[in-house]
């Protein structure tokens, strides 16, 4: 299902997508030495896997929005490659009014896309170049990260126009 407004895109993933997301989240957790390293939220293993599965679902909806039919979530690439395509870093939060959070390890050449919601229902809010997100305007005084409010994000339809996100 795909509902597009002038500002956001609502998408739903299937039960099969949810199972795939959980399987990948489990595999990621099983291959990590320290699942909580660098995490803002310090969750137990089960909650961490569930959170990661929802983030993988967010990657799926962004890939579909961009028309990537053969999208496969990555396993153990961490920040060495993009989540979607070659330049899209997907940021997910279950908070409807949540911020897009960028960390120092995020690649400056990427475009960060904020997705909110809980599986299976997601809303793609907007995007911003990581290099712009990493400016003093968005720097958090609570952590070594940058918090971009939704009003500061570009609308999703603009990512399809004139932005070479796939290269």
Task: State each model region's role.
Residues 1-84, 91-167:
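Nucleic-acid endonuclease domains
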């Amino acid at each position: 299902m795909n509902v597009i407004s002038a500002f956001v895109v609502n998408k739903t993933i299937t039960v099969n997508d949810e199972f795939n997301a959980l399987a990948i989240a489990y595999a990621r957790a099983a291959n990590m030495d320290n699942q909580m390293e660098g995490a803002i939220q310090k969750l137990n293993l089960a909650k961490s896997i569930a959170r990661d599965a929802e983030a993988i679902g967010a990657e799926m909806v962004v890939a579909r929005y961009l028309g990537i039919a053969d999208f496969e979530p990555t396993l153990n690439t961490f920040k060495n490659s993009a989540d979607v395509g070659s330049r899209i870093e997907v940021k997910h939060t279950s908070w409807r009014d949540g911020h897009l959070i960028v960390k120092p390890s995020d690649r400056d050449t990427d475009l960060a896309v904020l997705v909110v919601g809980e599986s299976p229902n997601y809303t793609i809010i907007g995007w911003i170049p990581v290099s712009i997100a990493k400016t003093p305007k968005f720097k958090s005084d609570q952590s070594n990260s940058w918090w971009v409010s939704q009003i500061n994000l570009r609308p999703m339809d603009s990512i399809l126009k004139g932005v070479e996100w796939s290269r």
